[in-house]
Amino acid sequence: MSIRSKFNKDEKKFVKFIDSTEEIIKHLNKSDSSKRSRLKLSGQQIDVLESNFKIDSHPNSATKSLLSNALSIPLKNIQIWFQNRRAKEKTARDGGRRRSGNAEIEDGEYEHGKMSYQAMCPFDFPPQERYFL
């Protein structure tokens, strides 16, 4: 047997030791049937969540708890729904584009921090002769 069990009577703990790579591989290759299934919300549940989101996009814990009980949805799923919905709204507000940290914009400034080229490089371009004397 590749798994040994040890019971320490003093500490009353049960410890398993895995002795082989085979057991580790077997554990990692377990079927996905033990994986929890995704919660599918009904149209009515989504309508209630959306209407509450319009009122308050950051509900307090009491409101989330009430929604959880009223809709028979775990509290954690309510929290995640609001988090995802806020992210969706932010993406829609930003036009769906990703922003890079220092994307150049037309007037020679950088979007992040609004630093001009002149502030980044104090000498003129193209370099003038005075720099090479």
Swiss-Prot record:
The keyword RNA-binding is assigned to this record: no
Cellular compartment(s):
Nucleus
Q: Which residues bind DNA?
A: 34-93
InterPro entries per UniProt: HD, Homeobox_CS, Homeobox_domain, Homeodomain-like_sf
Which key words are in the record?
A: DNA-binding, Homeobox, Nucleus
- Give any GO molecular function from the UniProt entry: DNA-binding transcription factor activity, RNA polymerase II-specific
Taken from the UniProt entry, a GO cellular component term is: nucleus
Question: Out of the domains of life, which is the source?
Answer: Eukaryota
Instruction: Detail the disulphide connectivity of this chain as listed in its UniProt entry.
Output: none
Pfam families named among the record's database cross-references: Homeodomain
- Which parts of the sequence are annotated with region: Disordered? 86-109
Identify this protein by name: Homeobox protein HD-5
